[in-house]
């Protein structure tokens, strides 16, 4: 494919923005190529500025569950924007959106809208600390919860340790209040609570990890977290920014039948516009200002465009939508399994609803340590060929693929064929 216009655009961008992008993964560094600059999308397809067409499995990193430029969503947005983009005062649509979220998400009795997933997790941690009067948060290695200081933490040595900053600019004092253990390791969680339990305000977890690839919880893991946090008076916080309305009609918590105290949302609930939300038990949420003493505010929180995008996205999703995702996922998994076996390349495939992840290794992936063993050089080579074959994948081994209601069986078969062609070229 011809990428000449994208190459020129990136050459200009590196002098205008750090790394030439506004979010690091968009730089395509892990696949050793210049980023592809996109121009438009429709349905399951996305088109770059050179005119190349791709079947899109990035979907703006998850929000576009109805595909690109859904007619109902864009029609509602066109109407809404003519009424004004933001008012700094409540709107009736905020009520309708809140009612819809409360109806669909089992844990949420009250909800606060914000403007990003990072803002949602940041506020949820502040609320957990304010509600419990405790300081420490336990998170899992490889689970990404946005770029707030207390969550940009990785583990030191040992099973359960005080965290170390994962980015320059994160104070050590902040890191010391974050405990990190391996995802899916309930024994490590128990040990952490034995050591620090009197001061752990909450456990934050992606019910399906989505930023080390796609890594579902092992049997009993989420149930164990629910039991341990309840026993110690800590809050269980589900970060469903990615999994919310992607894993199931009632989010991951409905799918797995484990109800947290607080839930963070984003991505799908904005229909492609900037948005976030956090909610949970009424007695906890009433600690948020102006009802309570825990402060949180935002100029664009609940803005009418994001609420419009979210409301008209969620309104179109039905339980049957998720049956369709499962059908397409079954087809893709079977096809990839056959293709990689044909080429004698090891592959592990993980799925959760409309999220699919594959790893180029033989061992079943249950945490970041195992995910890191994937063949990154092979992934990078394959990525380039997949793009040349008209398939747009996330440009990182540690990001999952997303399906939309607009993907078709034909799209899936073309994708399977593209993997076959790509492996034929590079092996």
Swiss-Prot record:
Membership in a protein family: Belongs to the class-III pyridoxal-phosphate-dependent aminotransferase family. HemL subfamily.
Location of this chain's protein in the cell: Cytoplasm
A single GO molecular function term of this UniProt record: glutamate-1-semialdehyde 2,1-aminomutase activity
Pathway(s) of this molecule: Porphyrin-containing compound metabolism; protoporphyrin-IX biosynthesis; 5-aminolevulinate from L-glutamyl-tRNA(Glu): step 2/2
Disulfide pairings: none
GO BP term, pick one: protoporphyrinogen IX biosynthetic process
Name of the protein: Glutamate-1-semialdehyde 2,1-aminomutase 1
Main location: cytoplasm
One of the record's GO cellular component terms: cytoplasm
Gene responsible for this protein: hemL1
PROSITE patterns (alphabetical): AA_TRANSFER_CLASS_3
E.C. no: 5.4.3.8
Modified residues (N6-(pyridoxal phosphate)lysine): 267
Quaternary structure note: Homodimer.
Organism whose genome encodes this protein: Macrococcus caseolyticus (strain JCSC5402) (Macrococcoides caseolyticum)
Domain of life, source organism: Bacteria
HAMAP family registered for this protein in UniProt: HemL_aminotrans_3
Cofactor: pyridoxal 5'-phosphate
Top EC class, one word: isomerase
Upper lineage: Bacteria, Bacillati, Bacillota, Bacilli, Bacillales
Catalytic activity: (S)-4-amino-5-oxopentanoate = 5-aminolevulinate
Keyword annotations of the record: Cytoplasm, Isomerase, Porphyrin biosynthesis, Pyridoxal phosphate
